[in-house]
């Protein structure tokens, strides 16, 4: 019985840890000196899927961007802190920060 418990615990713990993960997405437009940011959201999908959805939303809106990143934090507070740092750095660099109300589907 003990080996089964250990196996179940090994499977459950990473699942619990990932349930607390949060992301936000950002997409810089270097030529236009802009950066597009999403609000933080629970990381319920892969990074690739989140980046693809964010890029698709920007493209449909006609926004020009160079690439998309959706960094992960170990919780909502960590993601908010990372996002705020990105905002501060980009403002210091003279970039316009554009906060979007986007949320991923899924």
Predicted features along the sequence, with ranges:
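Sec-dependent N-terminal signal peptides
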Residues: 4-13
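Compositionally biased P/S/T/G-rich terminal and signal peptide-adjacent segments
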Residues: 42-62
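Short Trp-Ser/Thr-centered turn/loop motifs at beta-strand boundaries
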Residues: 20-22, 26-47
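Surface-exposed, polar helix/loop patches in the mature regions of secreted/periplasmic/lumenal proteins
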Residues: 73-106
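Sec/Tat signal peptide C-region and signal peptidase I cleavage site
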Residues: 13-19
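A short, exposed loop/beta-hairpin motif centered on an aromatic-Gly-Thr core
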Residues: 36-44, 63-78
